[in-house]
Amino acid sequence: MCIRDSYIYKGVKAMKPWVKVSTCPVGKYKDTSRYPSRGWNAFHTVYQDVQGWLGEGIQDQIYPMLYFRGNHFYPFALDWQEQSNGRQIIPGLGIYFLDPSEGNWTLDEIERQMHFIRAHGLAGEAHYRVKYLMDNTQGLYEALEEDFYTAPALQPAMPWIDNVAPTPPSGLTVETPENGYWKLSWQPATDNDKRNAPMYVIYGSDTYPVDTSNPENILAQRVQGTEYTYAPIRPWTARKYFAVTAIDRCGNESEAIQQQ
């Protein structure tokens, strides 16, 4: 990474530390001990020293274009994760190959890659191109909705920028008006950092206390202000108990205030 690029990263962080600086490099960095890159890689072919940038700590996220399968995908995805320096690796998946005119991959191939990503602790995946996702090519959209993206997700924290959680909110009250809407209100977190003022995550569950480690319990996130109206589309699915946490722009989440 040249000095100028280092200055760019430091300049961004000086102005807005929570802004993520990321790169979308060629999918294979170098030959690995597990499998060769077969002559086309980021480092030697297009001079992208991305793992060097990760080592310097001047990247927050990497989206390697891993539009491959088999031995051209798995060893290189793992290599990125092993050299991540704690940063977030989000492989780009070549879902356009599901189209018969592009490659006629099967849906199983993409699903195996996503299971691998989760099993090895990578931060997520990107889908290229979105057209093939929205067109539900080979049932991809349905598979993601039913099997992979079944619950909301909070943004991953960036502890190398800020690892201090905001103070929790307090005084959570829950009103149940006659129209079936739940009105939640609370006292704000007491943090004074106006540039990194926390927002709130609302959780709901049928059991008490509400388990805020379970994403299935997330009802809303990035809530501003100190009130929230819970209006379930299907009243018979309404949650019974509620909790609220504060979360800052770097993804640090406070302890929860539980409904009393």
Question: Which residue stretches match the model-derived regions?
Answer:
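Short beta-strand segments within Ig-like beta-sandwich modules, predominantly Fibronectin type-III
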Residues: 219-225
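Active-site clefts of carbohydrate-active enzymes
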Residues: 19-39, 76-112
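Substrate-binding cleft/loops of secretory-pathway carbohydrate-active enzymes
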Residues: 14, 20-63, 68-79
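Substrate-binding cleft of secreted/luminal carbohydrate-active enzymes
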Residues: 50-73, 87-160
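Pro/Thr/Ser/Gly-rich low-complexity, intrinsically disordered linker/stalk tracts
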Residues: 139-140, 144-195, 250-260
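Beta-strand-rich modules
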Residues: 230-253
